[in-house]
Amino acid sequence: MCSSDLFAESLGMGTSMVVLMPQAAAGIGMEGSDGASGAAGADGTGRDGAGADGRGRGVPVLYLLHGLSDDCTIWERRTSIERYATEKGIAVVMPEVRRSFYADEAVGEKYWTFIAEELPELIARTFRISTAREDTFVAGLSMGGFGAFKLALNHPERFAAAASLSGVLDATSLDLSWTGTLGERVWAGNEIAGTEDDLLGLLAQADPAALPSLFLDCGTEDELLDHNRRFITAAEERGVELASRLRPGAHTWDFWDESIQDVLDWLPLQDR
């Protein structure tokens, strides 16, 4: 694990991220352990410097996004994501975006520019991670589910797959009164429909053949269930292939801990 504070040019300030690199060999307590720690270095290399997969090839990467009330450490604190990812041989990048809705805030910081442009370039320079589309994935929960599908729909050429867990998938219908000044800070009262934040609008105009694989998971007791139902309907109307699952569960970490394991199983990871 690498937990890092960094200066982001697009934000004009310092920010944080957590990066998990897969172990070069099975570690103690992992299935198939040979007794070696197998910990990867900060640049993703093993002890022989050959790269996390042992052959000098960059490893696949999952950008894993946090929700509105969380930060870049939440996935590690609430799930066993490091163990899950190590078993799959995939790197995980968890950036900090505060309560930005993965947007260039109207009154605030350019978090969309950071997440969509600066962060991937920074990761490619710093870690031994593949930049190939077929090795690049994104997922998130709640606000992070919105961010994951926003990246996938605005930049389908970059991602092989995207997953939303209990996602905020219809920002045009949000009642922002409960979030205080969030709506004014992020959107300044401007219309969301027809913008890069209008996921249903983007879906309606998308070329289904050009999109990454999409996965949606939401609990039937989740307050965002209607958002997810609307996205499923919009995908069906556009002929977009969507792996969707509405199952018993609420907006909880018990649900997401199970869900992220299913996402990792679903990802089209290449034989390495």
Outline where the language-model segments fall.
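Non-catalytic cap/lid and distal C-terminal segments of serine-dependent acyl enzymes
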Residues: M1-R272
